[in-house]
Amino acid sequence: MTKILGSDPVKRGMAQMQKGGVIMDVVNAEQARIAEAAGAVAVMALERVPSDIRAAGGVARMANTTIVREVMEAVSIPVMAKARIGHIVEARVLEAMGVDYIDESEVLTPADEEFHLLKSDYTVPFVCGCRDLGEALRRIGEGASMLRTKGEPGTGNVVEAVRHLRKVNAQLRKVINMSHDELMTEAKYLGAPFELLLQIKTLGKLPVVNFAAGGIATPADAALMMELGADGVFVGSGIFKSENPEKFAKAIVQATTHYQDYDLIARLSADLGEPMRGVEISELAVQDRMQERGW
């Protein structure tokens, strides 16, 4: 069967090629080159990393197209970029620019509080965040080709990413072990398409890859998420807000690849300098929690 450009198999296949790797947020060409040299499988081009977006407040939008273009020209690995939830034109602009992936991201200020993008209408593949299986399947139903935990971006605190990944995986196990006649009721409970639950039961897993994101700040954090079953990791502020970005980037890539080699992770964690400053989640007001954006 001929594979059609923009079809689900093609778009999901692109995400499969990133499996086991690290995707790093970058704000300029120099950072993109550091990420590529460290072994990142892709970079996410944006104007400000999540911790700076959080600190600045106000409205966070799609990155200036000049930044996205400079990053695309600087590296040979895939380049992703963020669009606001529901912002059709930002997504179309990024698609026209030729980015490899679009992240419909809660890190940016949502443009639409009711509707997410219909991602199946685009040729470019999308990645979306999720906190549970219901969110995951709603995004896949809209056409997402890749998932990531929402976590709590820009905090350097991995606890929410752990919570979200564990919840998705627990709900997956529940669905896989259900009888077929129970799936429709579970679909109603989750607010998710029945056909996707049936697909999960048949496959024994999600139909797309699910990376960990939101608060990953150290090599041990990255290894933890892989240990818990993530297909790879996104690192936002954790690298370029650390004391030594080059060393942190290389160490996180190695820890992700060799996540059960604890002696290696111990060596990688030595003499790295200070990681990014962390934020306690309980100190954040609900309206300041990016994970609450979208549904």
Curated annotation (Swiss-Prot):
The keyword S-adenosyl-L-methionine does not apply. This is Pyridoxal 5'-phosphate synthase subunit PdxS. D-ribose 5-phosphate binds at D25, G154, G215, G236, S237. Gene3D superfamilies: Aldolase class I. It is an enzyme of class 4 (lyase). Its EC number is 4.3.3.6. One of its GO terms (molecular function) is pyridoxal 5'-phosphate synthase (glutamine hydrolysing) activity. The active site is at K82. Catalyzes the formation of pyridoxal 5'-phosphate from ribose 5-phosphate (RBP), glyceraldehyde 3-phosphate (G3P) and ammonia. The ammonia is provided by the PdxT subunit. Can also use ribulose 5-phosphate and dihydroxyacetone phosphate as substrates, resulting from enzyme-catalyzed isomerization of RBP and G3P, respectively. Pathway: Cofactor biosynthesis; pyridoxal 5'-phosphate biosynthesis. CDD domains: pdxS (cd04727). Keywords: Lyase, Pyridoxal phosphate, Schiff base. D-glyceraldehyde 3-phosphate binds at R166. InterPro entries: Aldolase_TIM, PdxS/SNZ, PdxS/SNZ_N, RibuloseP-bd_barrel. It catalyses: aldehydo-D-ribose 5-phosphate + D-glyceraldehyde 3-phosphate + L-glutamine = pyridoxal 5'-phosphate + L-glutamate + phosphate + 3 H2O + H(+). GO terms for biological process: amino acid metabolic process; pyridoxal phosphate biosynthetic process; pyridoxine biosynthetic process. The keyword Lyase applies. It comes from Actinobacillus pleuropneumoniae serotype 7 (strain AP76). The gene is pdxS. Belongs to the PdxS/SNZ family. In the presence of PdxT, forms a dodecamer of heterodimers.
